[in-house]
From Swiss-Prot:
Taxonomic classification: Eukaryota, Metazoa, Chordata, Craniata, Vertebrata
Keywords: Membrane, Transmembrane, Transmembrane helix
Protein's name in the database: Transmembrane protein 187
Transmembrane helix is among the record's keywords: yes
Membrane topology: Multi-pass membrane protein
């Protein structure tokens, strides 16, 4: 294991493992989740193994892992703090792909719950990264933020749309904090990355929600809205990386008042 990113990878793997253990105890079994091929516009292909029953929707999840590996191995002129933040985010992407693939493969409620739950701390991490740019290295603040993010999934136990409410709040917080960071320290380059990231996020949401409606059009009958929503999701990951690392690799735009690790 590369020592430069090994610690971050272990932290993400352990946290994800603890979430999996919690889910498999059954504490979230009452959460409303969509399970079954009928929720996807891509029709399952007879004769293919279960893990490839919807081949395009399944294989696109490899893009998360490839993106995570790519960013884990990127270096650049970064201090220990920014490198750790980058590596945690990359490890999240790397491990998120297999979780989503497991959900498609098994069509198991608990796999769907785990997929939902792990989405929240992923959206919370850019907020933590922006706080680092503004306030410096505060690991307990970042840990507290992630714990609050994970705890917010409890809303799914209280209401059928609780997860959507929690996710919406995470998206608003991430975009709002990114806008604040750009306003204080940004450039035309960071503005481009931010705009592309927000557009990718909108594409992710709209294409996923309109999966079945879009399937009426020939363009979306083979590669469906769900497939393209995952492409947009990977792109928003990538543009978030570009936006956030821009401030660490271009000292001109780095906040002058923040303490670095």
């Amino acid at each position: 294991m590369n020592p430069e990113w090994g610690q971050a990878f272990v932290h993400v793997a352990v946290a994800g493992g603890l979430c999996a253990v919690a889910v498999f105890t059954g504490i979230f079994d009452s959460v409303s989740v969509q399970v079954g091929y009928e929720h996807y516009a891509e029709a399952p292909v007879a004769g293919l193994p279960a893990f490839l029953a919807m081949p395009f929707n399944s294989l696109v999840n490899m893009a998360y892992t490839l993106l995570g590996l790519s960013w884990l191995h990127r270096g650049g002129a970064m201090g220990l703090g920014p490198r750790y933040l980058k590596d945690v985010f990359a490890a999240m992407a790397l491990l998120y792909g297999p979780v989503q693939w497991l959900r498609l493969w098994t069509q198991w409620r608990r796999a769907a719950v785990l997929d939902q739950w792990l989405t929240l701390p992923i959206f919370a991490w850019p907020v933590a990264w922006c706080l680092y740019l503004d306030r410096g290295w505060r690991p307990w603040l970042f840990l507290s933020l992630e714990c609050v993010s994970l705890a917010s999934y409890g809303l799914a136990l209280l209401h059928p749309q609780g997860f959507e409410v929690a996710l919406g709040a995470h998206v608003v917080a991430a975009v709002g904090q990114a806008l604040r960071t750009h306003r204080h320290y940004g450039s035309t380059t960071s503005a481009t990355y931010l705009a592309l990231g927000v557009l990718s996020c909108l594409g992710f949401v709209v294409l996923k929600l309109c999966d079945h409606q879009l399937a009426r059009w020939r363009l979306f009958q083979c590669l469906t809205g769900h497939f393209w929503s995952k492409v947009c999701d990977v792109l928003q990951f990538h543009f978030a990386f570009l936006f956030l690392t821009h401030f660490n690799t271009h000292p001109r735009f780095h906040p002058s008042g923040g303490k670095t690790r």
